[in-house]
Amino acid sequence: MIISAASDYRAAAEARLPPFLFHYIDGGAYAEHTLRRNVSDLADVALRQRVLRNMSDLRLSTELFGETLAMPVALAPVGLTGMYARRGEVQAARAAAARGIPFTLSTVSVCPIEEVAPAIERPMWFQLYVLKDRGFMRNALERAKAAGVTTLVFTVDMPTPGARYRDAHSGMSGPNASLRRMLQAVTHPRWAWDVGLLGKPHDLGNISAYRGSPTGLQDYIGWLGANFDPSIAWKDLEWIREFWTGPMVIKGILDPEDARDAVRFGADGIVVSNHGGRQLDGVLSSARALPAIADAVKGELKILADSGIRSGLDVVRMLALGADAVLLGRAFVYALAAAGQAGVENLLTLIEKEMRVAMTLTGTHSIADISADALSRVTRERADAISP
């Protein structure tokens, strides 16, 4: 298969993975309207082409939370990444480090913090959920500190799990799920050998280290479902802000007022995100929500964005809409599933090349130059029309 874009990696991942895993990463909540709009709304963002601007001094590097990034991209936290490639979190972290960008480890990773952090030379980020078991949260934060994690990404848009209908059809959940997953694995021998057999243990490493016993895929939904905390409020995060002295990013912001609350709370950054369309179907896409949030808090904290980003062109679009950097989720998992660390490295190379083309043809010499001026007049008017 010829690989020239993230969509090619998606096709390769679908061919290689058992359906329950492919559809788990590919699907969204309910009828998946927001999932689709994340991509289509971003694709509708028209840029303003400029010519004869002497673009010989193009620069993609940027500073974020005291780190130098080769480009304004970080790999997003994705649960169960280690089920998509053998010790997948380690491979993805190495790919990110090789391309000079951060990797964010999920709370529900297969590989624990202590396995991933020593595998790379640059600092790692860590994502944490708001859970009822505060002992687990404190334990995870202590272990993250000990492992040299620099930035905490705090996910707040999961007080309860989203309803993902596709999971029931694919075998991730629903009737006879275990049997269906086993049959799917048997019919995908390359994955079964490389990940199913050689990729063991299939464990949620960060959770089992706290519980003192293995926590496999079957426990994933049950343990998390019992521990999501619908009573959480900003005041409940105060002890975390006191405990964690490094940069803290609040992930899951879609409303300007919530963004202002994050500023008042003392967050160092936010992620404008609808969880990749996996939580509440029918909410705004990140691309539609971003301009109003940027108008409200730009300059008071760092604004990151995710959901729907599939190319370097999409990265430039998000920056023009008001983001300082982006998180890349599904796209890197497709590449990881298809070709491991090399696949993720190649995807990041493609994204960098696409960014260079977009910046050259919009006359933006550096990341700091990418602003609303890079948007077409039609796009700017549309963004103004949906601002609260």
Swiss-Prot record:
Q: How does it sit in the membrane?
A: Peripheral membrane protein
GO-annotated molecular function: FMN binding; L-lactate dehydrogenase activity
Which biological process annotations from GO are given for this protein?
A: aerobic respiration; lactate metabolic process
User: Which InterPro entries would you find in this protein's record?
Assistant: Aldolase_TIM (IPR013785), Alpha-hydoxy_acid_DH_FMN (IPR012133), FMN-dep_DH (IPR000262), FMN_HAD (IPR037396), FMN_hydac_DH_AS (IPR008259), LldD (IPR020920)
Q: Which domain of life is it from?
A: Bacteria
Name the catalytic site residues.
H275
Key words, A-Z: Cell inner membrane, Cell membrane, Flavoprotein, FMN, Membrane, Oxidoreductase
Q: Which positions does UniProt annotate for substrate binding?
A: Y24, Y129, R164, R278
Location of the protein in the cell? Cell inner membrane
Q: Which family does it belong to?
A: Belongs to the FMN-dependent alpha-hydroxy acid dehydrogenase family.
Outline what the protein does.
Answer: Catalyzes the conversion of L-lactate to pyruvate. Is coupled to the respiratory chain.
Q: What is this protein called?
A: L-lactate dehydrogenase
Q: Which organism is it from?
A: Xanthomonas axonopodis pv. citri (strain 306)
